[in-house]
Regions:
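Compositionally biased, proline/threonine/alanine/serine-rich low-complexity intrinsically disordered stretches
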Residues: 29-36, 50, 203, 207-213
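Short beta-strand edge/turn micro-motifs at domain boundaries
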Residues: 155-183
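N-terminal secretory signal peptides and thylakoid transit peptides that target proteins
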Residues: 1-19
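Juxtamembrane/interface motifs at transmembrane-helix termini
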Residues: 80, 115-121, 191-193
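C-terminal segment of N-terminal export signals and the immediately downstream linker at the start
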Residues: 4-9, 23-44
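Early exported N-terminus immediately downstream of N-terminal targeting peptides
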Residues: 34-114
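Low-complexity, intrinsically disordered terminal/linker segments enriched in charged
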Residues: 173-213
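Surface-exposed, charged secondary-structure patches
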Residues: 100-102, 108-156, 211-213
Length: 213
């Protein structure tokens, strides 16, 4: 399921254009305070890190981890943004199933990223994860920039895009080494949607979420 990989520069430019378009002008909600956004990221990483430190990445309780991620990330908003114009075309049944499957698909992606960049030897979060800086992006969002140190090799740059939620800021995109999760998934899903529409994407996702991460 997916398109041929885009070049990194293309993905970065596409991400900037897409995310900029998602921020309307005028009197929308203000961007969250940078310190609050950093605390949300730090708390989420710490919780997930401690869960993973207790066992193998593959054996982590899926629903427990999803519940933790749900506290810090707006997966429903991310899912709608990924679907783009097709969200308006989907009927209520398709929307409900899509969001349910999308949560689990993101879990699979999350575990794959962890395996790739973190490995099995987690160590202490304070030794492997560092928030570098944060800055406002557009009128409504804050970008928290961080660095993750893998067991071997160079540190990995991980940026978190947050927007004000109901009670506190929520994560709406994850950008690893300049590659936006939102933009990447929108490109991959778009290819499937062009071929088979909403039902075609749902069929693909049903298969994907039953496969080992």
């Amino acid at each position: 399921m997916g398109l041929a990989p885009l070049h990194r520069r293309q993905l970065v430019l596409a991400g900037l254009a897409l995310l900029g378009a998602l921020v309307p002008g005028g009197t929308g909600a203000a961007a969250p305070p940078a310190a609050t956004a950093e605390e949300v990221v730090r708390r989420l990483v710490d919780q997930v890190w401690r869960m993973l430190a207790e066992g193998e990445v593959e054996n982590v309780d899926r629903e427990h981890l999803l519940a933790v991620v749900d506290e810090g990330a707006d997966l429903s908003l991310l899912g709608r943004l990924v679907l783009g114009r097709y969200w308006r075309q989907a009927n209520p049944r398709q929307r409900t199933e899509y969001l349910r499957l999308f949560r689990h698909y993101i879990f699979q992606t999350f575990v794959q990223r962890l395996r790739q960049y973190v490995g099995s030897d987690l160590g202490y979060v304070s030794e492997r994860f560092q928030i570098i800086a944060s800055r406002q992006v557009g009128e409504r969002d804050v970008l928290v920039q961080s660095r993750v140190a893998p067991p071997t090799g160079q540190p990995v740059r991980v940026d978190w895009r947050l927007r004000e939620g109901q009670d506190e800021p929520v994560i709406i995109d994850l950008i690893v080494e300049g590659i936006s999760l939102l933009v990447t998934q929108r490109s991959e899903f778009g290819a499937v949607l062009e071929r088979g529409g909403i039902d075609g994407l749902l069929s693909e996702l049903r298969v994907r979420v039953t496969q080992p991460a």
